[in-house]
């Protein structure tokens, strides 16, 4: 009887530990897309890949609480500028012609729709690769060359 109780208690304890064990990321750390607001003017812009310590600075029109029109969006991580988006925005997302530069040397210049490259554009990577031509929903495929921007390989059908 005592032994059975210990086994049962042990099994319940193991179950309790399994249910409460850390899963690698806390709920607060899980990355989800969404909106981010400029702390100074409250204007919201789309954040396709949120990360800890991010903030933005929006220089452009704010219509109904969203960045809208020609403007410059600067992205910061822990106070350091790591991306600049210059161009046309509609309801907080890149829409139209824009130039996006990253501090690691990447640069995209071209057409955007709903915050993804869509239409003619050129991506220059940090290792001097150039992907120039037609982009569809953040996906580039030409001959045997493939690239993504604000899209995954799976979303682009590259798997």
Model-assigned labels for residue ranges:
Residues 24-159:
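Glycine/tyrosine- and acidic-biased, solvent-exposed loop/turn segments at the edges of beta-strands
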């Amino acid at each position: 009887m005592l032994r059975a109780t210990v086994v049962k208690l042990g099994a319940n304890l193991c179950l309790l530990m399994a249910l409460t064990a850390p899963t690698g990321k806390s709920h607060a750390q899980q990355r989800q897309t969404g909106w981010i607001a400029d702390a100074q003017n409250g204007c919201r812009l789309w954040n396709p890949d949120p990360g800890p310590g991010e903030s933005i600075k929006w220089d452009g029109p704010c219509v109904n609480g969203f960045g809208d029109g020609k403007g410059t969006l600067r992205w910061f991580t822990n106070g350091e500028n790591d991306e600049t988006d210059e161009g046309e925005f509609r309801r907080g997302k890149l829409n139209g012609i824009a130039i996006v530069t990253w501090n690691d040397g990447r640069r995209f210049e071209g057409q955007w729709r709903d915050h993804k490259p869509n239409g003619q554009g050129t991506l220059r990577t940090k290792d001097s690769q150039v992907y120039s031509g037609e982009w569809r929903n953040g996906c580039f495929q030409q001959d045997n060359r493939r690239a993504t921007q604000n899209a995954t390989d799976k979303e682009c059908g590259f798997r």
